[in-house]
């Protein structure tokens, strides 16, 4: 729900094996807000976004990977170590190059 909406704003999304992700707001009589309706279609495409938003369906980590919702599925026991190692790898790169790389899709998102 809200956790996935927050994750949609991130440059990289990983899931622990066994994780379940979704935007079940419609089942609660609520609108998912801009994160769900604006960011989700950019991440998974409009057809998958409509499916997830209109049904409130929850997907497991493997399906999230297949949909492009996450870029990696990591065993739960190793999750923290793996994401911290990735953070260290990114932090060790050139900051300006990293910043410019994350801005690669900004013109597309503002149209």
Outline where the language-model segments fall.
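Acidic, divalent-metal-coordinating active-site segment for phosphoryl/phosphodiester hydrolysis
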Residues: 56-63
């Amino acid at each position: 729900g809200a956790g996935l909406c927050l994750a949609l704003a991130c440059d990289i999304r990983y899931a622990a094996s066994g994780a379940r992700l979704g935007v079940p707001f419609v089942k609660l009589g609520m609108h998912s807000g801009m994160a769900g309706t604006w960011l989700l279609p950019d991440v998974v495409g409009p057809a998958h976004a409509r499916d997830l938003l209109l049904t409130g369906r929850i997907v497991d980590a493997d399906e999230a990977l297949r949909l492009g919702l996450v870029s990696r599925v990591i065993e739960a026991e190793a999750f923290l170590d793996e994401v911290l190692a990735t953070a260290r790898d990114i932090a060790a790169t050139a900051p300006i190059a990293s910043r410019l790389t994350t801005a690669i899709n900004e013109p597309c998102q503002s149209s």
